[in-house]
UniProtKB/Swiss-Prot annotation:
GO biological process: mitochondrion organization
Gene: letmd1
MF terms in GO: ribosome binding
PROSITE patterns recorded: LETM1_RBD
Function text: May play an essential role for mitochondrial structure and function.
This protein's name: LETM1 domain-containing protein 1
Source lineage: Eukaryota, Metazoa, Chordata, Craniata, Vertebrata
Source organism of the structure: Xenopus tropicalis
Domain of life: Eukaryota
Bilayer topology term: Single-pass membrane protein
Residues on Cytoplasmic side: 1-130
Amino acid sequence: MLSGMALCRTRNCRFMMGEDGRRMRKCVLLLYQPCHLSTNSKPKSMLSLIASKAKYANEKYEHFLERKFPNFYLLYSTFMKGFRMLMTEAKEVGRIKQRMNHQGIPFHQLPYREMEKLRQFRRDIIKAAPVVIISIPPFANYLVFVLMYFFPRQLLIRHFWTPKQREEFLDIYHRMRVEAYPEILDGLLNAVPKLSERNLRNQMFQLCTQVQHGTHPQVENLHAVCTAFSGPPLGMKRLDVQQMKALSRVMFLTPHLPAFLLQHRLGSHICEIQNLDCALLKLGVNELSEEELKRACYIRGLNSTHLSREDCETWLHCWLQLSSMLKVSEASLLLHCMVLLSANYLQSIKQ
């Protein structure tokens, strides 16, 4: 069929060009050549063949690593699984963002899981961006393996941690939070004399000393002092620089920023947690998986790594109860409760 089309075009060309042989032959060759090439090209089948060969070679390579170098294979498989998880989450976040734009849905009106996914993905991608960029060129993922081996906690996000590393690193990060506890409690005690009401001063002093001596506070005791956190000296816009730096460490935010940026970041992050609390109350704590439950407790200040589901649910119910009772102007109390509600909870459940 194609060769017939080439002959037909040749006769038309001879008729139009006349008796000029050289021009006619050149035209015949140019017209025939594309028809000749198009009959033999099979790019799609070649690409699929190459892809299948590459997949087979990769599977053989993975089996070889698993047999000969099991420790390295663990790093390799962790990285590949983590990268796929990250790409899957990126697609899900893209769909959520697209729906927000098309339907005009603000962040605080999203369902809990979508809100939490956006919050966590934003923090993950900031930390993972350098590693992802490094891994794009061919064979550059071997450099990533070196980084995974020597600096997994500092450079990699949770997707690229092994289960053992995840547990170990969460403990390390929480110990970093605990180091800021004394400074935060001392800051609260130093603020007590500046409170105007005598009864409020007594309640605040009693609350702080109880926490310092190992007592876990009740929600009622915390709510009783909420007015102290709506204005000076403990309101969100009245905290001193040292207190804001200590609270930033508890929230895993860098403390090495000017005061106005520390205040802005603390305010935006605790507001984000309040929005998550509202969405979680609608969903219900019982609807969370164990992993979601432990993560929800951890970002609110509790080291939930070694706790049972029941203990996590008890603590999270207390947090949500207090959060639902507070006004927006009292957000500073919720921020301080990352210490007040978490410092002695483990000891209280052991007693």
